[in-house]
Amino acid sequence: MENIMTLPKIKQVRAWFTGGATAEKGAGGGDYHDQGANHWIDDHIATPMSKYRDYEQSRQSFGINVLGTLIVEVEAENGQTGFAVSTAGEMGCFIVEKHLNRFIEGKCVSDIKLIHDQMLNATLYYSGSGGLVMNTISCVDLALWDLFGKVVGLPVYKLLGGAVRDEIQFYATGARPDLAKEMGFIGGKMPTHWGPHDGDAGIRKDAAMVADMREKCGEDFWLMLDCWMSQDVNYAIKLAHACAPYNLKWIEECLPPQQYEGYRELKHNAPAGMMVTSGEHHGTLQSFRTLSETGIDIMQPDVGWCGGLTTLVEIAAIAKSRGQLVVPHGSSVYSHHAVITFTNTPFSEFLMTSPDCSTMRPQFDPILLNEPVPVNGRIHKSVLDKPGFGVELNRDCNLKRPYSH
């Protein structure tokens, strides 16, 4: 009889944060909205707060960067560690150190699903439908997968069953699709800058932006719009039709997460051939099931916000059962190891975090070391062939551990 590998138990979980309202500004990392001045990601982008003129010009003005980066590290009895980052900051540290630790420490490093289910059920009374608590749970879940991979000496994608393709091809999200084309990406997704409070003039301005980029990028390069929950269904339908002459591939997250009937209406009335996508700010498996039922074309969960890798795999199965694509929102290596195993993810997103989109900067810079970036718009599976998620924590960052247990 062959010997079975004996797996260690988890000795301790620790939580740090960087950036956010109680620390240094512009820290970047897991909270990638926390950038310095003159960055495209904070330049008059349409949001649900844009209708208030005091908060129209900058997303940081209404506090998009107040949370900061949460770093969760889990240590096994043999001294090996796994870690992950997300957006939850100091408050996420409290949840990990004062509540979730009891479900983690003492468990086997392979008990990921058990820990995940216990965290979800234990926080139901204060987690609502996602948000900060789910971001924190997601970060713990990712750290557990990282630890498990490092203990058994395998990359996470092999723990999920292995790659179904040799490489991941990417589109780029940022203000300059024309530069993304030069870098080898298959498409470029731009933020909208106007919303319902701007009326038809706003539609004309955003449609003109798409027209300009279509002229610069040529006929075949994908162009998409990210609306970041800033519209109502009537405005979204009008904008979609205004952009149809420029072969807009999809229109994304036009409505707030819970407006399922609105998404159904938008999909029904969108121009033929234009896809409707959403999911970035949905925070539970149940919400993705309901979103899938609206008939949208692509679901876009963020693995750092939706419940972690454990939930992302379940979301992909829901999408696959309906013939839908699942294309996660950004998330770097945490997405890479998942999507290369999904048959319904033919491409993925790369978020441009350089201020003017002119250079390739790792999404979670500077908190991750050895974080890969696409080369000619692609990442080969061999780049992912390192234990766990294949990245290391940059301990030279200003890490703060406000709580312990």
Swiss-Prot record:
The active site is at H329 (proton acceptor). Mg(2+) binds at D226, E252, E280. GO terms for molecular function: L-rhamnonate dehydratase activity; magnesium ion binding. Gene3D superfamilies: Enolase-like C-terminal domain (3.20.20.120), Enolase-like, N-terminal domain (3.30.390.10). GO terms for biological process: amino acid catabolic process; carbohydrate catabolic process. Its EC number is 4.2.1.90. Its cofactor is Mg(2+). InterPro entries: Enolase-like_C_sf, Enolase-like_N, Enolase_C-like, L-Rhamnon_dehydrat, Mandel_Rmase/mucon_lact_enz_CS, Mandelate_racemase_C, Mandelate_racemase_N_dom, RHMD-like. Keywords: Lyase, Magnesium, Metal-binding. The record marks E349 as: Transition state stabilizer. The record marks D302 as: Increases basicity of active site His. The keyword Glycoprotein does not apply. Binds 1 Mg(2+) ion per subunit. It catalyses: L-rhamnonate = 2-dehydro-3-deoxy-L-rhamnonate + H2O. It comes from the Bacteria. Substrate binds at H33, R59, E349. It is an enzyme of class 4 (lyase). Reaction proceeds via a syn dehydration. Catalyzes the dehydration of L-rhamnonate to 2-keto-3-deoxy-L-rhamnonate (KDR). Homooctamer; tetramer of dimers. This is L-rhamnonate dehydratase. It comes from Escherichia coli O6:H1 (strain CFT073 / ATCC 700928 / UPEC).
